[in-house]
């Protein structure tokens, strides 16, 4: 089982994804660079957690779209 992400990471990730949906992909490395450019996060650990959560959200959205289009 994974660890639960704090609420501030989830809310920041969702806000960035809603504001800049075209900037993020399902690649963690690309999302890490995008988060560094778009948000002023001084901590590398927090930046990586936000980028990881965004990656997870993007992958989840892609699978939902795939299952909806197949049905």
UniProtKB/Swiss-Prot annotation:
GO terms for biological process: translation. InterPro entries: Ribosomal_eS17, Ribosomal_eS17_CS, Ribosomal_eS17_sf. One of its GO terms (molecular function) is structural constituent of ribosome. GO terms for cellular component: cytosol; ribonucleoprotein complex; ribosome. Keywords: Ribonucleoprotein, Ribosomal protein. It comes from the Archaea. Belongs to the eukaryotic ribosomal protein eS17 family. This is Small ribosomal subunit protein eS17. It comes from Pyrobaculum islandicum (strain DSM 4184 / JCM 9189 / GEO3). The gene is rps17e.
């Amino acid at each position: 089982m994974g660890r639960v992400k704090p609420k501030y990471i989830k809310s920041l990730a969702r806000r960035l994804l809603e504001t800049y949906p075209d900037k993020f992909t399902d690649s963690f490395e690309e999302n890490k660079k995008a988060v560094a450019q778009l948000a002023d996060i001084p901590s590398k650990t927090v930046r990586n957690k936000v980028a990881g959560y965004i990656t997870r959200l993007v992958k989840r959205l892609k699978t939902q779209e795939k299952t909806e289009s197949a049905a």
